[in-house]
Swiss-Prot record:
<dbReference type="InterPro" id="IPR006638">
    <property type="entry name" value="Elp3/MiaA/NifB-like_rSAM"/>
</dbReference>
<feature type="domain" description="Radical SAM core">
    <location>
        <begin position="137"/>
        <end position="383"/>
    </location>
</feature>
<feature type="binding site">
    <location>
        <position position="151"/>
    </location>
    <ligand>
        <name>[4Fe-4S] cluster 2</name>
    </ligand>
</feature>
<keyword id="KW-0963">Cytoplasm</keyword>
<dbReference type="InterPro" id="IPR002792">
    <property type="entry name" value="TRAM_dom"/>
</dbReference>
<dbReference type="InterPro" id="IPR012340">
    <property type="entry name" value="NA-bd_OB-fold"/>
</dbReference>
<dbReference type="Pfam" id="PF00919">
    <property type="entry name" value="UPF0004"/>
</dbReference>
<dbReference type="GO" id="GO:0046872">
    <property type="term" value="F:metal ion binding"/>
</dbReference>
<dbReference type="GO" id="GO:0005829">
    <property type="term" value="C:cytosol"/>
</dbReference>
<comment type="function">
    <text>Catalyzes the methylthiolation of an aspartic acid residue of ribosomal protein uS12.</text>
</comment>
<keyword id="KW-0408">Iron</keyword>
<protein>
    <recommendedName>
        <fullName>Ribosomal protein uS12 methylthiotransferase RimO</fullName>
        <ecNumber>2.8.4.4</ecNumber>
    </recommendedName>
</protein>
<feature type="binding site">
    <location>
        <position position="50"/>
    </location>
    <ligand>
        <name>[4Fe-4S] cluster 1</name>
    </ligand>
</feature>
<feature type="domain" description="TRAM">
    <location>
        <begin position="385"/>
        <end position="453"/>
    </location>
</feature>
<dbReference type="GO" id="GO:0035599">
    <property type="term" value="F:aspartic acid methylthiotransferase activity"/>
</dbReference>
<feature type="binding site">
    <location>
        <position position="14"/>
    </location>
    <ligand>
        <name>[4Fe-4S] cluster 1</name>
    </ligand>
</feature>
<dbReference type="InterPro" id="IPR007197">
    <property type="entry name" value="rSAM"/>
</dbReference>
């Protein structure tokens, strides 16, 4: 029997891009291709790129260059593949003319066509060797579940719609089947992702789908309830990311706080507020009522006291005054956001924000970002100290001689904090990766926790 052709794979960018990579790798394995862990062991290399900010563009271009140098046969996909250069030609083909093919994001079919053209598929693919959940690039105990593609918003700082298109929601039955297969495969935590999770179903007018004979609307609240019910059967977690602050988000909070889904639909919201001053939000083309947002955050916490709120912000947006920036700092203090990320505004090629007046010097943008993070760290440290002395449920991610590293319901992988768990004193309390354990919290800083089983 002849040796199977081998494909190397490089995956860059956000969790949405990671899911695209998983889908491509799943299809490659289904058709009998092997995945190579090295450039020199591969017959060709696929690079899945990111093109959102300048640093990501450069990282992607460097990765393509490295793959060309080390292997020579490279197919490029992802967001950067949809980006044009200043001359109007494809940016990747202009910088790296030797690439075999370039596609945009979410393009499994096009990538496979390119692979077939340059590396014909084997005659006997091993479809049965591919698990029902597909090939995953995350650890076995957690996985990303992408519920839609694209975005209908036109935020002035963002070019995602030009690369990934308008919102396209996946059929609810398809989403539920993937979730079930993931839980069956041993996944303990599903991270629901999209460009705009709250808008799920808008494009299909919230039409009714069916799962196991039950009607389920293509709508975030209904999907979350169905996922919560499924997760409860497996003792697993569901975590919500990229939740745009629509009024409909209010309906999800009770699912986190009470009833059969409590402890399965995690009390965690990743809400990209971006700013708090109405004038800045208006220039960003974002919802512009910070007072109402504060009221909603307070109401959410009344309903669900354990709620963790993560958000991202931009400091130094064009035209942002010192007074407007201070409004943002006040908002972070009053809202007591648990987890916060902040970017100093950086012009993105193709974004309409580039045409706005009032661009700030680099040093002002960076100084504001640093001040913002100081305030955010103070708020986070204060909230983290409240957890000392409590016993929390922790999902173990790593185990070593010095103990384990895990996460609570308040911590998403990669972006939030962790819990450092002491080694188990008794054999009966030993734990392994993917286990849920009860941990008494003994210490905290602004980001992480320490505890013992």
């Amino acid at each position: 029997m002849s040796q199977s052709p081998k494909v190397g794979f490089v995956s860059l960018g956000c969790p949405k891009a990671l899911v695209d990579s998983e889908q491509i790798i799943t299809q490659l394995r289904a058709e009998g291709y092997e995945i190579s862990g090295t450039y020199d062991g591969a017959d060709l290399v696929v690079v899945n790129t990111c093109g959102f900010i300048d640093e990501a563009v450069q990282e992607s271009l460097d990765a393509i260059g490295e793959a060309l140098t080390e292997n020579g046969k490279v197919i490029v996909t992802g967001c950067l593949g949809a980006k044009s250069s200043a001359s109007g030609s494809n940016l990747i083909e202009e910088v790296h003319p030797k690439v075999l093919a370039v596609t945009g994001p979410h393009a499994v079919g096009e990538v496979m066509q390119a692979v077939h053209s340059h590396l014909p598929k084997p005659h006997d693919p091993f479809v049965d060797l591919v698990p029902a959940a597909g090939i995953k690039l995350t650890p076995r105990h957690y996985a990303y579940l992408k519920i839609s593609e694209g975005c209908n918003h036109r935020c002035t700082f963002c070019i995602i719609p030009s690369m990934r298109g308008d919102l396209v929601s996946r059929p609810v039955a398809e989403v539920m089947l993937e979730a079930e297969n993931l839980f069956k495969s041993g996944v303990k935590e599903l991270l629901v992702i999209s460009q705009d999770t709250s808008a799920y179903g808008v494009d299909v007018k919230y039409r009714t789908g069916f799962w196991n004979g039950k009607p389920i609307k293509t709508r975030m609240t209904d999907l979350v309830a169905a996922l919560g019910e499924l997760a409860a059967q497996y003792g697993a977690w569901v975590r919500l990311h990229y939740v745009y602050p629509y009024p409909s988000v209010d309906e999800v909070i009770p699912l986190m706080a009470e009833g059969p889904f409590k402890g399965h639909v995690l009390p965690y919201l990743d809400v990209p507020f971006q700013h708090a001053h109405p004038e800045v939000l208006k220039r960003m083309k974002r919802p512009a009522n910070a007072e109402k947002v504060l009221e909603r955050v307070q109401k959410w916490r009344e309903i669900c006291p354990d709620l963790t709120i993560r958000s991202t912000f931009i400091a130094g947006f064009p035209g942002e005054t010192e007074e407007q920036f201070e409004t943002l700092l006040d908002f972070v203090r009053e809202a007591e956001l648990d987890r916060v990320g902040c970017f100093a505004y950086s012009p993105v090629e193709g974004a309409t924000a580039n045409d706005l007046d009032g661009a700030l010097p680099d040093e002002v943008r960076e100084e504001r970002r640093a001040r913002f993070m100081e305030v955010a760290e103070e708020v986070s440290a204060h909230r983290m100290q409240r957890k000392v002395g409590k016993t929390l449920k922790v999902l173990i991610d790593e185990v070593g001689e010095e103990g384990g590293i895990g996460r609570t319901a308040a911590d998403a992988p990669e972006i939030d904090g962790v819990v450092y768990v002491e080694p188990a004193a008794k054999a009966s309390k030993r734990y392994k990766v993917g286990d849920f354990v009860s941990v008494k919290i003994t210490g905290a800083d602004g980001h992480d926790l320490w505890g013992e089983v």
